[in-house]
Amino acid sequence: MASAREIRRRIKSVKNTGKITKAMELVSASKMRRAQRNVLATRPYADRLYDVMGELTLRSMGGGTKHPLLQPHPTVTRVALILITPDRGLCGALNSNLTRAAARFITDQKSQGRSVSVIAIGKKGRDFILRVGQKLDSEIIGLGDAPPLVDVLPAATTAINGYSPDASGNYDYDEVYLLCAEFVNTLVQRPKLRRFLPVEAPGNAGATKVDYSYEPSQEDVLDQLLPRFIEVQLYQAILESIASEHSARMMAMRNANDNAKELVRDLTLTYNKARQAAITTEISEIAAGATALNQ
């Protein structure tokens, strides 16, 4: 059994660690609430844009308009993956779940004879892609907790330009997929994979009761609005990923703090037992000495 002094030192060390994890839990809780507010603040604009895109896409399909971002390519041999991860760790299994999902996606695509390029948003995802030797076309790191839309645009531009045919009819990607953390609730954040390009018609297409009038023309509005729609979709995914990161970190630090408290209780019990054993031994030695003197 360790000495009482060593146990006291361990108790002090664990208590100090518990203070750190408690502080990180409180900071993450505050950042999570702010991230949730950011998601809610952008939702009205995103919802209205979604409604307009639903109506506009339906009209475009009915009118025979073929926008390159709406049209699937005849064959799929080159795929891009937009991978959104946190820049930092200490957020439970969130990073490992995302990187495992990315690895499964890449393996599945390669098994179908497709090449995969990655657009990484977040340091953890970028580092993972470089570590496994996968092709990295673009990266964005250090976005922070409340990134402006302009900081996200390079990733969206890379995806749009890679999917859209150039003047010669050539393009870099046949499909683009998005992998990010879906914020279900404070306790649950899970990887979410979906096709990003070509743009699919919103599920509410034709459901709106508003009769929109487009100026100067429906085609011109579609040309301008469709890239904005893609950018907003990516921006919303990033904001949701940030909320997931802080929620996962808050829960991880809460669990760490609870474990620290439990460890302190166990160490305190061990310390008390060691102290009791030392006192009992000392009393026994005194009693034995007194008995020897009386004889």
Curated annotation (Swiss-Prot):
Query: A GO biological process this protein is involved in?
Result: proton motive force-driven plasma membrane ATP synthesis
Give the chief site where it resides: membrane
Name the GO cellular-component terms.
plasma membrane; proton-transporting ATP synthase complex
Keywords attached to this Swiss-Prot or TrEMBL record, sorted alphabetically, are: ATP synthesis, Cell membrane, CF(1), Hydrogen ion transport, Ion transport, Membrane, Transport
State the compartments where it is located: Cell membrane
Q: How does it sit in the membrane?
A: Peripheral membrane protein
Q: Which Gene3D superfamilies match?
A: 3.40.1380.10, ATP synthase, gamma subunit, helix hairpin domain
> What superkingdom does the record give?
Bacteria
Gene Ontology MF term list: ATP binding; proton-transporting ATP synthase activity, rotational mechanism
Looking up NCBIfam families in the UniProt record yields: ATPsyn_F1gamma, PRK14111.1
What PANTHER family is this protein classified in? ATP SYNTHASE GAMMA CHAIN, ATP SYNTHASE SUBUNIT GAMMA, MITOCHONDRIAL
Q: What does this protein do?
A: Produces ATP from ADP in the presence of a proton gradient across the membrane. The gamma chain is believed to be important in regulating ATPase activity and the flow of protons through the CF(0) complex.
- UniProt family annotation: Belongs to the ATPase gamma chain family.
What does the subunit comment say? Answer: F-type ATPases have 2 components, CF(1) - the catalytic core - and CF(0) - the membrane proton channel. CF(1) has five subunits: alpha(3), beta(3), gamma(1), delta(1), epsilon(1). CF(0) has three main subunits: a, b and c.
Q: What is the official name of this protein in its record?
A: ATP synthase gamma chain
- Its source organism is Herpetosiphon aurantiacus (strain ATCC 23779 / DSM 785 / 114-95)
Designated gene of the protein: atpG
